């Protein structure tokens, strides 16, 4: 009986632990679909990747803002997105570190790093990091 109970507990814990992890291919697909919404100026495509309770943070005063505020503050920048490249996407467990380069519609380059967390196949949070001069914003991007 003890063996059965112990085995059941181990199985439950391992299933729960594995449910928290995301495969690299799945994370990359979510990330690229999220950014495709920006490239296509399609909020619904981007929003479809976000979990309930999603938050966004950045050095621009965005401290764990909710989806509605994120849409209002950040998504309008999609009008500046020309192309995007991903030099690196690193996934570990339910987290990813994403390095990306956006070339704006006026040929300026933005390079950001973001720390993503996932929950049930959706993006739970994004923490964006860029230089203190606000280079992460398209209006402040540097010439190519």
At which residue positions do the language-model features occur?
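Short, low-complexity N-terminal intrinsically disordered segments enriched in polar/charged residues
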Residues: 4-6, 14-44, 48, 139-144
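Short beta-strand segments enriched in hydrophobic/aromatic residues
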Residues: 50, 100-104, 130
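A short gly/proline-enriched turn/hairpin at secondary-structure junctions
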Residues: 53-65, 77-80
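Short hydrophobic/aromatic-rich beta-strand segments that constitute the beta-sheet cores
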Residues: 56-57, 98-99, 125-126
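Surface-exposed, charged secondary-structure patches
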Residues: 71-108, 113
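Short, solvent-exposed coil/turn segments at beta-strand boundaries
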Residues: 92-95, 116-124
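Low-complexity, intrinsically disordered terminal/linker segments enriched in charged
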Residues: 127-144
């Amino acid at each position: 009986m003890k063996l059965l109970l112990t085995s059941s507990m181990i199985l439950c814990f391992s299933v729960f632990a594995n449910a928290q992890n995301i495969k690299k291919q799945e994370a990359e697909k979510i990330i690229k679909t999220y950014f495709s919404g920006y490239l296509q100026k399609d909020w619904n495509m981007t929003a479809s990747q976000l979990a309930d309770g999603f938050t966004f943070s950045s050095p621009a005063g965005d401290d764990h803002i909710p989806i509605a505020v994120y849409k209002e503050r950040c998504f309008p920048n999609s009008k500046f997105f020309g192309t995007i490249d991903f030099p690196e996407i690193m996934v570990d467990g339910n987290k990813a570190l994403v390095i990306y380069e956006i070339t704006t519609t006026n040929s300026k380059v933005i390079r950001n790093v973001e720390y993503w967390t996932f929950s049930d196949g959706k993006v739970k949070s994004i923490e964006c990091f860029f230089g203190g001069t606000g280079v992460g914003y398209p209006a402040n991007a540097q010439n190519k």
